[in-house]
Amino acid sequence: MKQFKQIWKWRHLILALPKIVWFNFHYLPFRQAIRLPILLYKPRFRHCKGSIRLQGNVHFGQIKFGFPNMSSYPDTGIIWDNMGGTMHITNGANISIGNASSVYIHNYGHVDFRGDFGATAAAKIICCHQIKFGKNVLIGWDNLITDCDFHALTHINNRGGNIAFAPISIGDNVWIGLQTITLKGTCLPSNVVVAARTILNKDYTPYGEYVLLGGSPARKLKDGICWNPESDYVDYIPINNNLL
């Protein structure tokens, strides 16, 4: 009975095994693909062009697309749509992009993970130019990260068009709260926390490190704030029924 429960728990991963094997050998050299470093949960492939490059130690399950599965969002796995761009993962980083998420990389897009990265659920990463993530980056639920507007605006007094894309750079040890929108040209320094439902759209490095950003658009809310991934736990306390 215990073995059956384990099989049932991982049934979607087992059913996706043919796609997992194909995806690894499609994108990686044999010596890396044989380790199955990329696991996929309920994958849906739109385009599987471009490349994925892994540098550093490579191990089984190092990269997880489509899980963990969060009960607050639909159990829809991951949408992968690479039109011909590159995903580059260095330093043996562990990557996790949760369920109900999607990754789109344009022909000229370049997504760079320089360290461990986690997106809980319903993350949408859209890269038409360049997106860089530092070490130990945590993305809350329902985040949108896009380096492109997909439409160019023109000023009535200027014949030239507006550049509709710009690189995004996220520093080390950054926590971005749920339902935040990160737009083109965003540059976050290391050791910052971004409040929920924030809109990021510019260079925030002049604020320095250890700050809390929030608002629409974002501004500095407080100094001396940081997120430490090594001590990120909450000690919940039961309700005292005598006080109810």
Question: PLM features: residue spans?
Answer:
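Short helix-loop boundary/capping segments
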Residues: 145, 150-155
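Flexible glycine-rich beta->alpha loop in the catalytic core of nucleotide-sugar glycosyltransferases
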Residues: 150-151, 198-199, 205
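Conserved beta-strand->loop/alpha-helix structural units within folded catalytic cores of enzymes
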Residues: 177-178, 183, 196-197
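Short acidic, glycine/proline-rich loop/turn micro-motifs
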Residues: 155-159, 225
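Domain-scale signature associated with acetyltransferase and cell-envelope carbohydrate enzymes
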Residues: 1-146, 167, 171-173, 180-182, ...
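Short beta-to-alpha loop/turn elements within the nucleotide-binding domains of ABC transporters
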Residues: 186
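A short acidic, glycine-rich active-site loop
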Residues: 159-168
